[in-house]
């Protein structure tokens, strides 16, 4: 029992800074929305439309680079720190190549925006302008993620938290300058949010690089000599590990976007209630997601040390802590669902629907916690391909079709509206949790030699 308590302390010490970093990131998006809304409703809508295209694109790159964390954790645990610098350098090359592709996609996103049904031309132009300003931040964001993954792979999660809050503090005044046109800068409105956010990502990257250069604990990595040219073999391996994660993230983000589109014809009350419940459940999701990042680090480190039993302990502890957290957040959600809905909107119909949907959100929080921490465990074992297959099957083969049938057809019951999609979420997330656990048990029952061989690839 003592080993689980000790492991839980280590996991929480790693996870809490990640939680705070994620809160800072979420707050940046909130600040952009509020400040753009303060300028005009059109500008706020433009930022919202632009963000809906930016997020899937940049999260694809983010997911691809998540492969670095278990690689570095495993090298650190095995005492092969001399190989870390080369992996990080290849991570920067990969981030550079991917950012060029993302920038090309975002530059041409105007075709998508202008093809939207009945979109106001002025709104479309502002959304395109916002994206074309924001896309210059894509390299800065991805380079920052490489540096952050280096630190987190070495079990140092506090730098990412600090840089997140630096970014938030810089974002507010820079937004003010470019939205309203102060200190000689042009008045750009919502487009100014894109300029500010792009600048903030570069500031966060440069601040993280400055920290790494000064950190004594990384001196041996920083001083590593060798070529900085692209290494096709290393980059291929990072892509093999990262691409399934990137696709899984992409499918998850697009799932919720598709559901939002399917809910939109049902009316303002249904859309508002759905959005409130989704926004709140996304905030609660920060907890298991951060714990999953910590579990990846611990499992990778233990496998690097050659201890499959300690890796199992880290995995089981992460799941136990995650279920406890999810139980508490579910109780909190059920108990205060109406008060929470009132924070977003005071329309009685919207509040009633949102409170009902939050009951369903509370049901799936435990499944959601298990599946996301399970994904973190599999990343630690470098078994990322299964994450993609599980996510695709659970969300797109089971969750979305069942939600669609329940919400919009009478094949099973009378059309349930948004609640049908939320039952679909429960089906999808529960299926993902079950499949993640089955895959984890399959891996852990392998002979130790095979587990360690797979982890050292």
Swiss-Prot record:
Signal peptide feature range = none
Which HAMAP family does the protein's record reference?
Answer: MdtK
Q: Does the keyword Ligase apply?
A: no
Write down a Pfam family by its short name: MatE
Chain's role: Multidrug efflux pump that functions probably as a Na(+)/drug antiporter.
The scientific name of the source species is: Escherichia coli O9:H4 (strain HS)
Please report the name of this protein according to its UniProt entry.
Multidrug resistance protein MdtK
As for subcellular location, the record says: Cell inner membrane
Listed PANTHER family = FMN_FAD EXPORTER YEEO-RELATED, MULTIDRUG RESISTANCE PROTEIN NORM-RELATED
Indicate how the chain sits in the lipid bilayer: Multi-pass membrane protein
The record's Gene Ontology cellular component field reads: plasma membrane
Biological process terms from the Gene Ontology for this record are:
sodium ion transport; xenobiotic transmembrane transport
Q: Which family does it belong to?
A: Belongs to the multi antimicrobial extrusion (MATE) (TC 2.A.66.1) family. MdtK subfamily.
Q: Where are the transmembrane segments?
A: 11-31, 53-73, 93-113, 127-147, 160-180, 189-209, 243-263, 276-296, 314-334, 350-370, 387-407, 418-438
Which keywords fit this entry according to its UniProt record? Antiport, Cell inner membrane, Cell membrane, Ion transport, Membrane, Sodium, Sodium transport, Transmembrane, Transmembrane helix, Transport
Indicate yes or no for the key word Transport. yes
Q: Which InterPro entries match?
A: MATE_fam, MATE_MdtK, MdtK-like, Multidrug-R_MdtK
